Amino acid sequence: MFNYTTTNLSAMPYAQAKVLHFEDGTIQLRSYATIVATIDREGWLSIHGLYSMTTRKHIGAFMREFTGMEYQTAKQIYTDGYQMNIHTGEVIPLC
């Protein structure tokens, strides 16, 4: 198991959401007890589910803070079954 540190979302410091920063550079968003988004060390963003309205707000805050993009981008890549590179904008099907 990788070691990681945990921080709050800047825009939602008291929310039931945590950002996990792994030693290898991977970043994950945990909303309540569920991992809902991952950015791997190469910049590939994957959204694992949209879940509740509150979790969607967490995803939106995560997107703005870590990608500079909005929730609608996360929703689109999730519903289309893609992952997106946050550095290049490249989009590929989920493996």
Q: PLM features: what roles do these ranges have?
A:
Residues 1-95:
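Terminal leader/tail segments of proteins
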